Regions:
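Amphipathic alpha-helical interaction surfaces in cytosolic regulatory modules
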Residues: 19-97
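Short acidic-hydrophobic, aromatic-tinged amphipathic segments that line or gate anion-handling sites
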Residues: 98-102
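Short beta-strand/loop segment at the start of cytosolic alpha/beta domains
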Residues: 1-15
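Residue-level detector of flexible, active-site-proximal loop/helix-junction positions
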Residues: 12, 20, 104
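Short, charged, intrinsically disordered terminal tails
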Residues: 106-110
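Acidic phosphotransfer microenvironment of two-component signaling modules
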Residues: 82, 104-105
Length: 111
C-alpha cells in the first residue's frame, strides 16, 4: 500500500512510500483530501519512506498547510531525508513547516 494512514487521537499521520508528484500525486491528494474533509486538520506527513517530492507535490503540500491553518490545524513533517530537507531549505519552504526527527516528537508537538 503506497499511502497509509494512522490516527493518534486527534492527530492523523500519513506515510507514503510513493513519490508525492507525477503520476502518483492524484492518488495521494485524493486520500489526503478525504482525510481533511473528515476533520483531519492536525496532520503529520511521515517522510521516512518517501522517495521524493516534485514541484507539483510541494505546491500541494503548501496548499494543504494553508487549509490546515484555516481550520486551526497544521501540517507537520517528520522523518525527512537529507535530500528532502535540502530541497525545502533551497526553496525556503522549510520556513512554512515544522520539522521533527521522529514521529513521537511530531505527535507530541500537537499537545
Amino acid at each position: 500500500v503506497p499511502t497509509r494512514v494512522n490516527e493518534y487521537g486527534a492527530v492523523t499521520v500519513v506515510t507514503t512510500n510513493d513519490e508525492i508528484g507525477g503520476e502518483s500525486l492524484p492518488l495521494f491528494k485524493d486520500k489526503v483530501d478525504k482525510l481533511f474533509e473528515k476533520g483531519g486538520h492536525q496532520l503529520i506527513l511521515d517522510c521516512s519512506e518517501l522517495p521524493g517530492v516534485d514541484s507539483e507535490g510541494l505546491e500541494y503540500l503548501l496548499d494543504l498547510q494553508d487549509q490546515c491553518e484555516e481550520h486551526v490545524g497544521a501540517l507537520k513533517i517528520c522523518g525527512a531525508s537529507e535530500a528532502l530537507a535540502t530541497i525545502l531549505r533551497i526553496t525556503r519552504l522549510d520556513r512554512r513547516f515544522e520539522f521533527f526527527g521522529d514521529l513521537d516528537e511530531a505527535v507530541k508537538s500537537f499537545g
